[in-house]
């Protein structure tokens, strides 16, 4: 704590209306490792440090310490006034509140006695009794400064705050998987007239939509972090680049659970995401009916079947090819390099080859 002596020396000069101390330094050593020694001129006297220091600031404080030691026998009370300035400097460096002094008076009016307290760094320090208010505040400031010097109140904040925040973060991380699983899944119903937009609804608000069979409408079910749909559900499933899974119902009739009748296209995406696309196969009936009035078909031309079927029914899509499925609209214009895979009155699927 040798750096306090420069402040004490300056406070003494201000109290007694003296000239401020003047510092001069000398330097030695190489440029990459200089050493400094300072002398200070105060009250007509020059005080010099006896050794060299690695920094100029340390050398100035050493010289000020010698000057303060020479003034202590003459006016010890004048040295004590520096403690108020030191508390203020500490508050400014730490960006904390300035010290707040409160003084109480006791005794007769012709000979009062003053006792001061100072609130600093979140604590209250009491000084000794003095004959004047100024000396009482000096005493309280000295007690506060010595307490900080001894390390009793270096920290003004709660030391347990970082650990409490860490515990909160850990609890949030542990509870996040349960929260994700507890969230209800959502459905996005896309209509042909708005191919680029969808309406997001919760299943809890519309239970009929959740319980409705696949024959009423062809839906796009969007869910996060769900296990992959097995290939025996007769659906067209694909993982998009942002991790969302799209299950597109491809038939309006219940489909028998026969995994050998489903054609799956496995394509590694550019980011390593596996795309599983299950399409209609040759076993599906043509123009099945639900109630005898409306018909819905899943028609695949023979040429398209040859393109989809290979060996055991699995075809690998080379890197750079993308399968796009969107609502069908007669006004849709396919890209020049598009290869149509499937189309009915609701949806159309085609393949793109991108360089």
UniProtKB/Swiss-Prot annotation:
InterPro entries: AtDRB-like_DSRM_1, AtDRB-like_DSRM_2, dsRBD_dom
CDD domains in UniProt: DSRM_AtDRB-like_rpt1, DSRM_AtDRB-like_rpt2
Keywords: Host-virus interaction, Nucleus, Plant defense, Repeat, RNA-binding, RNA-mediated gene silencing
Residue span(s) of domain DRBM: 4-73, 82-150
Subcellular location: Nucleus
Chain intervals with Polar residues compositional bias: 149-188
Single annotated GO MF: double-stranded RNA binding
SMART domains xref list: DSRM
GO cellular component: nucleus
Disruption phenotype: Elongated and downwardly curled rosette leaves. In old plants, rosette and cauline leaves and flowers change to red color. Increased levels of ARF3 and ARF4 transcripts, targeted by TAS1 and TAS3, respectively.
Tissue specificity as recorded in UniProt: Expressed in roots, leaf vasculature, shoot apical meristem (SAM) and developing anthers.
Segments of this protein annotated with the region Disordered: 149-193
One Pfam family recorded for the sequence: dsrm
GO biological process: defense response to virus; miRNA processing; RNAi-mediated antiviral immune response; ta-siRNA processing
Subunit details: Heterodimer with DRB1 or DRB5. Interacts with DCL4 and cauliflower mosaic virus (CaMV) transactivator/viroplasmin protein. Interaction with CaMV transactivator/viroplasmin protein inhibits RNA silencing ability of DRB4.
Entry function: Double-stranded RNA-binding protein involved in RNA-mediated post-transcriptional gene silencing (PTGS). Functions in the trans-acting small interfering RNAs (ta-siRNAs) biogenesis by binding and assisting DICER-LIKE 4 (DCL4). Required for DCL4 activity. Required for the 21 nucleotide ta-siRNAs production of the TAS3 transcript in leaves but not in flowers. Plays an important role in silencing RNA of both DNA and RNA viruses. Involved with argonaute 7 (AGO7) and RDR6 in turnip crinkle virus (TCV) silencing. May not be directly involved in viral siRNA production.
Stated name of the protein: Double-stranded RNA-binding protein 4
Organism listed in the record: Arabidopsis thaliana (Mouse-ear cress)
């Amino acid at each position: 704590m040798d750096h306090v002596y420069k402040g004490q020396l300056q406070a003494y000069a201000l109290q007694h209306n003296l000239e401020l101390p003047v510092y001069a330094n000398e330097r030695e050593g190489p440029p990459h490792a200089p050493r400094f020694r300072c002398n200070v001129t105060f009250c007509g006297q020059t005080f010099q440090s006896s050794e060299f220091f690695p920094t100029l600031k340390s050398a100035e404080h050493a010289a000020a310490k010698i000057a303060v030691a020479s003034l202590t026998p003459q006016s010890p009370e004048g040295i004590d006034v520096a403690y108020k300035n030191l508390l203020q400097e500490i508050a400014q460096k730490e960006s904390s509140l300035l010290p707040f002094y409160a003084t109480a008076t006791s005794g007769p009016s012709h000979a009062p006695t003053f006792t001061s307290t100072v609130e600093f760094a979140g604590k209250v320090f009491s000084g000794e009794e003095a004959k004047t208010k100024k000396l009482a505040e000096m005493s309280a400031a000295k007690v506060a400064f010595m307490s900080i010097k001894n390390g009793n109140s270096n920290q003004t904040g709660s030391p347990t705050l970082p650990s409490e925040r860490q515990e909160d973060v850990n609890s949030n991380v542990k509870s996040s998987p349960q929260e994700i699983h507890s969230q209800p899944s959502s459905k996005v119903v896309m209509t042909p007239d708005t191919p680029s937009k969808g309406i997001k609804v919760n299943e809890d608000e519309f239970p009929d939509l959740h319980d409705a069979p696949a024959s009423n409408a062809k839906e796009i079910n969007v869910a996060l972090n769900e296990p992959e749909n097995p290939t025996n559900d007769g659906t067209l499933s694909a993982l998009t680049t942002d991790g969302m899974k799209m299950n597109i119902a491809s038939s309006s009739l219940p489909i028998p659970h026969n995994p050998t009748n489903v054609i799956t296209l496995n394509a590694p995406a550019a980011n390593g995401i596996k795309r599983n696309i299950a399409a209609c196969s040759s076993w599906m009936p043509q123009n099945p009916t639900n109630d005898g009035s409306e018909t819905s078909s899943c028609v695949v031309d023979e040429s398209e079947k040859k393109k989809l079927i290979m060996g055991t029914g699995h075809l690998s899509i080379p890197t750079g090819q993308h399968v796009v499925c969107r609502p069908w609209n007669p006004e849709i214009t396919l890209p020049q390099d598009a290869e149509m895979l499937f189309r009915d009155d609701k949806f159309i699927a085609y393949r793109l080859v991108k360089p």
